[in-house]
């Protein structure tokens, strides 16, 4: 089974490309570290398969929490990222959520309906 990591980014925020890249990196690193500790077998598979990562866009913060609720109910590692507010958004603004790494079939059940960023 294919293993991947997905990051869902809010599109209602006025973030530049560099800011989005940094937020996605925060989500990916946070999820990877958590998976390395909590889901070692899946993490190792993901590493061996080339660390597939997908970034999708969601309309707003409400959608982030809908994704989180579903991921939590399925036991999928997830990390909601809140910005510190030094540059483009207010402190504490939720910018994205990372999911996985986990099996693609499970992540697609949660994020498959969203368009790629």
From Swiss-Prot:
It is an enzyme of class 3 (hydrolase). One of its GO terms (molecular function) is peptidyl-tRNA hydrolase activity. It comes from the Archaea. Coiled coil: none annotated. GO terms for biological process: translation. Pfam families: PTH2 (PF01981). CDD domains: PTH2. Belongs to the PTH2 family. The natural substrate for this enzyme may be peptidyl-tRNAs which drop off the ribosome during protein synthesis. This is Peptidyl-tRNA hydrolase. It comes from Thermoplasma volcanium (strain ATCC 51530 / DSM 4299 / JCM 9571 / NBRC 15438 / GSS1). The lineage of its organism: Archaea, Methanobacteriati, Thermoplasmatota, Thermoplasmata, Thermoplasmatales.
């Amino acid at each position: 089974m294919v293993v991947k990591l997905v990051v869902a980014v809010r599109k209602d925020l006025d973030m530049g490309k560099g800011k989005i890249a940094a937020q996605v990196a925060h989500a990916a690193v946070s999820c990877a570290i958590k998976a390395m500790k909590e889901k070692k077998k899946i993490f190792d598979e993901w590493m061996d398969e080339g660390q597939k990562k997908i970034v999708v866009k969601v309309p707003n913060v409400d959608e982030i929490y809908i994704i989180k609720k579903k991921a939590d109910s399925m036991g999928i590692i997830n990390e909601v990222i809140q910005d510190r507010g030094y540059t483009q958004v207010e402190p504490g603004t939720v910018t994205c959520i990372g999911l996985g790494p986990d099996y693609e079939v499970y992540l697609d059940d949660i994020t498959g309906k969203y368009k790629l960023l």
